[in-house]
Structure formats: C-alpha cells, structure tokens
Amino acid sequence: MKQYNVGIIGATGMVGQRFATLLENHPWFRVKVLAASPRSAGKTYEEAVGSRWAMTTPMPAAMKDMIMMDATADIEKIAAQVDFVFCAVDMKKDEIKKLEEAYAKAECPVVSNNSANRFTPDVPMVVPEINPEHIEIITAQRKRLGTKRGFIAVKSNCSIQSYVPALHPLRKYGLKNVLACTYQAISGAGKTFKTWPEMVDNLIPYIGGEEEKSEQEPLKVWGTIKNDQIVKTATPSITTQCLRVPVQDGHTAAVFVSFENKPSKEEILQCWKTFSGVPQELELPSAPKQFLHYFEENDRPQAKLDRNLENGMAISIGRLREDTQYDYKFVCLSHNTLRGAAGGGVLLAELLAAKGYFD
C-alpha cells in the first residue's frame, strides 16, 4: 500500500489527540498537518494542547513541534499538503457542515468524526465491518459537489458501536424490536475526571441528542443505496435511554431484542463467533482479528478489563439470556474513543484507501 499524507483537523481536542496517537506509527498514513481554532494557529502542537493532553501515552515526539494551522482560514493551504484529512472539530453543527464541504470542494477528502453530515443523504456513515458497500455513494456525492477527488465520509456515533455490531449478524432472523440502554463514559464528552470532577460518584440520566442518534443512525447504517442517496431501513423499531456514568473510557449497552424468527441461543452465539467483515478479509492495519468476542462469565464484559481488547477495536458481548418481554437480552461494550471515534475513523480511512478513493 502506498503512503498517504494526512491532516488532523481539530487536533487539540480529545478525539484529535487520539487520532495523533493512533497515526504516530501508522503503516499507510503520515501526519503532515495539524490544525485547530485560530487561537491555536501559529503555536506548536505542544503549546496549543498545553496541560490538556488527555492520553495515557505521551504526545508523539514527531508532532510536538509541528506548527498548528487554522482549520478554517488555511483550507486551501492544508488541501495542497495532504491526500485527505481526519476531522474532529468542536464547532456548531452548521459550521462543521460548511467546513467539511469546503475541504471536499478544495479536492481534499474528509473522514469525519463529527455528527454534522451523518444524515446528509449522499454521505456514507460507515461501520467498516457492517456497511462497507455504502462508500460507493461517494461517486454520486462527488457529482453533487462538482469534485474529482473531494468527498465526505463519516463514522457513526460512538453509542451505537457497542450494540449495532452485535445485532448485525442476527439480522437474518428479522430484527423486530430493540431496546438499548447505554452507559456512556465521560471521554465521550471530551472530558476526564480531572476536568469534570462532578462526575465522580455520579450518574447523569441525560446526554443531549444521544437518544435520537442512537435510534436513528442504525437505520441509515442498515440502509440501501437508491437514486444516488442512502435510504434508511424501516426496521427494526429501536428505543434507547442514554446515561453518562463515572467511567473514563468504554460505552456499555444493555440490549433487549425480539425477532420475526426467533433463533436459538446456540445460533446467536455461532453468528457472533463466525462473523467477519471486509476489514478482516482485507487485513486492514487497524482491524481486529476477531470483531465480536463473547464472554461466558456472568460478570463480563467490564469496561476496565475489556475495553482495550484488540487495541480497543473489538466489541465485547456477554450475558446472553432469554427474556420474558423480548426474545433475548445481552450486554455489550466498545471503547468509545477507539472503535467509537478515532480508531473507527482510521479504520474507515484504511477501507477507503484500500478501495482507491484517495488516489
């Protein structure tokens, strides 16, 4: 695979920092540009982040002294230096939409961690193991944007990446009704216990916009391409409750599901065990070898023990049981800033690179 020069837009935030650490020794991608808000522009990356470095590993040495660029004012300059950008900015939704489109129109593809373009009909929202074929919509999107190379591809919300992968191989039994209660880590809000002390010994029963995303995004991920847009699937019916819990990393979901054709417990376990996607077939650098891991123990998965499974890119599942109201219930866990954010973004970029979309 050839090498690609990349930029991180929004490099100073938590997801931007995670992108920086993941790309430090990436076999295909070299970080050439770091950009953020005007107040960071002109400073070194180290100066711009200051005491806000939230990763457990040190800031990549090769990036410390890189001079920050202005994500909005320097679009043309950035586009000239890189093959594509990762976008993880903290701005208003309509501003993000405008920004990402400006990069795409400057012939600089955008792999976005933001929610702004997730429901743009010709923007693929991809979990690489689940709907890799949605990247084919890029041809139609380029037509609309009037670009040769430029496009926007997004990853889905971190909350759905715990339970949608577990449900996906079971779709052949006809998913009917899904209830998911998510217990979401504070890093999902870009925070640590140091910056959000109110979360110690606390639980907040509301995360703005999260329930809507958690109920609607899976329907697009499972949708189909028709007439140059992605049309959402009508089923299953999904209802969610999303809670912020005092955990640093790792989103857990308690899932209840009913089927058109109820499978046996053994059939479900077999589906999870044997499921493999395009990233595994292509052996993409960030892909977990085994995407779905099932734990037999009653007290697993646990955020502390299992979130880093396969470099934080695998999904952990446990406690599969029959249910009196639904057919089955189970618990699943994913690392929200790895699989759920930057790691999922890097994996999506690897898929796009392998399929020639950056050439």
Placement of each model-derived feature along the sequence:
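Charged docking surfaces used in two-component/phosphorelay signaling
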Residues: S187-D359
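N-terminal Rossmann-like NAD(P) cofactor-binding subdomain of oxidoreductases
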Residues: M1-P205, S237, L309, I315-S316, ...
